[in-house]
């Protein structure tokens, strides 16, 4: 899709954002169907799939045997089965792991390459959707889905919509080019997810953290009532014995730097720097600002100052 008003490298804060369409090239859609699809997902994912309603999506995780998170995803009913939106960098590995335990199950698991993922946000986003699509989701019905399109509603950090579109709807968006102020790449949506507190797990940080360490309990992305699933024993033990030492934070700094995902985060105490956590995601925002998502030890004080190992820029926790 090519639009003339294209500012792919300009990422803006959510406040006072004009109508913006973001190409979500860093995410993909995985489809699972077959008579055993629900049972298989129930045995693998952290939420209770049996309680997932048709008109909603849920954040959840897929963990390894030791309770460490392979990936996080938004899952929902889709066509004759289920679909989930996941970071593209980890998708192939996660699918392979999910298929490993499906040998004796009647399921099909694959990435869909005939759909298009976009994020719509900013001024009058809801109005734009209502003009072009008959039904749109809201706080009472967070997902609208039919054979051609699916739309997810998000409230944080601003009202926004994730569009799962067919080629037909993609062409419709192209015809509405003049109504869209900005077309950004997926970094705009990534900024929103960071600000909303959704953990970003890419290939570099897969199998590194328990769900508790990336706030998935607080986000209601883990069920303790559904029974067994991979990693459940460790996750439950850490939860009930209060053994988790980490939490998810948003930090901000002036200037632009380019550290690697998984880099070490350091905290200054007195005159020394101490290793305190790890970098999950980074976005460069307009007006010379860098926003990062990090997993940090919960012993920190929010007034502390931080830096990324081998970089001088000072980061502060953003409330």
From Swiss-Prot:
Please explain the role this protein plays, according to its UniProt record. Folate-binding protein involved in regulating the level of ATP-DnaA and in the modification of some tRNAs. It is probably a key factor in regulatory networks that act via tRNA modification, such as initiation of chromosomal replication.
Q: Where are the transmembrane segments?
A: none
Tell me which GO cellular component terms the UniProt record holds. cytoplasm
Asked if the Swiss-Prot or TrEMBL record annotates the protein with the keyword tRNA processing, the reply is: yes
Stated name of the protein: tRNA-modifying protein YgfZ
Going by the entry's taxonomy, the superkingdom of the source organism is recorded as: Bacteria
Q: Name one GO biological process term.
A: tRNA processing
The cross-references to PANTHER family, in alphabetical order and at most eight, read:
TRANSFERASE CAF17, MITOCHONDRIAL-RELATED (PTHR22602:SF0)
The UniProt keywords, alphabetically, are: Cytoplasm, Folate-binding, tRNA processing
Q: Where in the cell is it found?
A: Cytoplasm
Any Pfam family the entry gives: YgfZ_barrel
